[in-house]
UniProtKB/Swiss-Prot annotation:
Protein name (record): Glycine cleavage system H protein
Gene3D superfamilies (UniProt xref): 2.40.50.100
Disulfide cross-links: none
Described function: The glycine cleavage system catalyzes the degradation of glycine. The H protein shuttles the methylamine group of glycine from the P protein to the T protein.
HAMAP family: GcvH
Residues annotated as domain Lipoyl-binding: 22-103
Pfam families attached to this UniProt entry: GCV_H (PF01597)
PANTHER family found in the cross-reference section: GLYCINE CLEAVAGE SYSTEM H PROTEIN (PTHR11715), GLYCINE CLEAVAGE SYSTEM H PROTEIN-RELATED (PTHR11715:SF3)
GO BP annotations listed: glycine decarboxylation via glycine cleavage system
Subunit structure: The glycine cleavage system is composed of four proteins: P, T, L and H.
TM helices/strands, residue ranges: none
Iron-sulfur recorded as keyword: no
Organism expressing this protein natively: Alkaliphilus oremlandii (strain OhILAs) (Clostridium oremlandii (strain OhILAs))
Manner of cofactor binding, per the entry note: Binds 1 lipoyl cofactor covalently.
Gene encoding the protein: gcvH
Length: 127
C-alpha cells in the first residue's frame, strides 16, 4: 500500500492535499485496492456545501459501490471531470487523481486527520 508524505488522511480512506484555504480530496491507494476495478465515479455539483463526514461521491467498482466521505467541511470549487470518462484513473494512481477541490470552511478540522505514517499504521491494523 502506497502513501504520500505531506498529504493528510482520514480513517475513511480519503486523502487531503491542502493549498492555502483550499484542499484537493481523493481516495487512497488502500481504498482503490479494496474496491478493485473502478468503473464509475459520481461527482458532486460545483458550489455544493459539504460537511465533514458527509458523503460527497460514490465510487463504483465491479465488486461494490462505496461512498467517499469528506474529511473536511467546505464548498466544492471544482470536480475532476476527467473521472467522468475515465474512472479507472483512480486505479492507475489514486493520489494523482483527486475527486473534488473545496474551499475550507473550518480549517481546524485538518488537525484531526492522520499523517502518512499514522495512516499507514492505521491500515496495517485494519488489514
Amino acid at each position: 500500500m502506497k502513501t504520500v508524505a505531506g498529504l493528510l488522511y482520514s480513517k475513511d480512506h480519503e486523502w487531503v492535499k491542502v493549498e492555502g484555504n483550499e484542499a484537493y480530496i481523493g481516495i487512497t491507494d488502500f481504498a482503490q485496492h479494496a474496491l478493485g476495478e473502478i468503473v464509475f465515479v459520481e461527482l458532486p455539483e460545483v458550489d455544493d456545501e459539504i460537511a465533514q463526514g458527509d458523503a460527497f461521491s460514490v465510487v463504483e467498482s465491479v465488486k461494490a459501490a462505496s461512498d467517499a466521505y469528506s474529511p473536511v467541511s467546505g464548498k466544492v470549487l471544482e470536480v475532476n471531470e476527467e473521472l467522468d470518462g475515465a474512472p479507472e484513473l483512480l486505479n492507475e494512481d489514486a493520489f494523482a487523481n483527486w475527486i473534488i477541490k473545496v474551499e475550507l470552511t473550518n480549517p481546524s478540522e485538518l488537525e484531526g486527520l492522520l499523517s502518512d505514517k499514522e495512516y499507514a499504521e492505521f491500515c496495517e491494523k485494519e488489514a
